[in-house]
Amino acid sequence: MKLTKVVLVTYPDDFILNEGKQLVLSIPNYEIVEVFTQKYLNHAKYGIGSGKAEEIEKFVQETKGIEEIIVDNHLTSKQIYNLEKLIGVTVKDRERLILDIFFTRATTVEAKLQIQLAEIEYEMPRIREKAKLLSNSKERAGKGGMGEYIVDVHFRDLKRQMSFIKEKLNDAKLKRKIYQHQRQKIKMYVVSLVGYTSSGKTTLFNLLTDESKEISPNLFTTLSTITRSFKVSHNKKHITRKKGEGILIVDTVGFISRLPTYMIDAFKSTLEESIVADLILLLLDSSEKIEDMRIKHLNCLQILEQLNVDKSKLITVLTKVDKIDRRIIYEIVRKLGINNNSNSN
């Protein structure tokens, strides 16, 4: 597989920098050649500062084979256009990168529809801006161009696509509600696994259900909810697992920081499995730095709040505790304010 050499531009914060690298490397053929950092990525012309943009342009000219610049923040069409014109290679922002990752991961019809919806939401605000940019660059409006008429047609077409996709997703939502009602009638309890991407959700899911779902350090390995049964029977020495009635375990889409609202909305029908669960296990990787855990914990709680999740159903679970000293567990619980006994986090 031919590698695509990219330059990452991100913030000089360790957590954000590491997450940015993870995102880029989640695209199978991407190779990070260099990382540039800057405190502010919201400058008017390029997103990044003019001096930093010129520094990157010089680096690209001196380094053969670089094909893309990834800016770890939201960029407007104008900023992307300006950067591409200056540097001479493709520029993508954080949201475009996440959408690209989604496309490489989607396997179910519903997941693909959700990604298409998110992409339309990403593109619609940019259409008229792109038209203005092309007009300013003296591209001929009209047939084959991006004149006002062409833009209006494209905009209406995207709105029709959006309506069609929402209708299909609503059909899937209704089917899910019927399934949920059937579960309630036969008294099937539902336990939902949520948390930051790569927190160990799928590992725990496989352990509890005897499944063999793919486990990967890459982000967004899971894009669709998977539900399997789990039966618990106790004795004094151990807990045995059997497929059967009693409890259903649900593995969900992994969370990530700075996920735009429209992307959360696109996956809302899938994430609703978390809302209707009888118990929600919020997983945190205890082998990470406590400060990173704190940030991820807050990010997860914010997303769950957006989904109107009942916090009384929520229990925080520390994973990978075999990799750390037991004393650190108490420090994590104290610093993150975890108090599962009172059902508050």
Give the positions of each predicted feature.
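Canonical P-loop GTPase G-domain recognition
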Residues: G88-A141, M146, S312, D322-N345
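Short hydrophobic segments within beta-strands
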Residues: V9-Y11, V194, L283, V317
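Conserved C-terminal guanine-recognition region of P-loop GTPase G domains, centered on the G4
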Residues: L17-L25, E57-Q61, H74-G88, H234-K237, ...
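Residue-level signature of catalytic and energy-coupling elements of molecular machines
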Residues: G20, I69, I120, L158, ...
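N-terminal accessory targeting/assembly segments
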Residues: M1-D100
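Hydrophobic residues in beta-strands of the RecA-like P-loop NTPase core, especially within AAA+ ATPase
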Residues: K92, I249-V250, L318
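Conserved G1/Walker A P-loop phosphate-binding module
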Residues: L134-I264, S274-V276
